[in-house]
Amino acid sequence: MTVARRVVVHGRVQGVFFRETARRRARRAGVAGWVRNNDDGSVEAWFEGDADDVEVMLHFAETGPSGAYVERVDVEKVEPQDLRGFDVL
């Protein structure tokens, strides 16, 4: 079953290759969506795919790449948009 989650990751998450690492991991997991920096210093992402694969990406969001310090992750269940690929915006 395809699921989608919109996440906002707070903490030291910009300037630590969070977006590029998310892109690589999402593509490896077969998860579609996007990731972008927000003006407030957070990182926002959309993960869409098989429930187990999206769960892998949610776990990544909770830890981030080395150098990141994740303080909080806000997760919202959203309707899948039939996205293809994974982009850094």
Q: PLM features: what roles do these ranges have?
A:
Residues 1-89:
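Intrinsically disordered, low-complexity, mixed-charge
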